[in-house]
């Protein structure tokens, strides 16, 4: 019997848990450990930011979803990883032993590395997390009341540029639907060496 632990339950962690469950032997056990009991389908965040989707429509409660597939689930943050002992110490003080560990914790957003960047302490919107996308949706509705030039893009250090392009086209579409696109000069900014 092998104890398989997936650390993280975002897009990569959930897919990995499903794939591992399909491939493992009947006597093996798989456990997913993550800090958030709710899964947010990140690829839909650009839609949330223009009110094409709601937060509720892109969320899944992980406990019943994993239970249906026979995957153990611990919605508790990991405090310590001990590779020599093949164990994780969780925030509730419990220890989780493993034979195989898959780390799929996703990105750590670093808005503080650029002054003025970010939806919390900065002056920019973000679609990186559903919380950010909801705030962007509120800002977008206010923006549409008084349309003006807008800048869309991704900064240096971004690990994924695709959503910035997607959001640009979504924004263009929604502004056209609202018949205000002609009032919104749009500039796309990227740290990529070429487009």
Task: List the predicted regions and their residue ranges.
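FAD-binding core/adjacent interface of flavoenzyme oxidoreductases
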Residues: 2, 68-166, 170-179
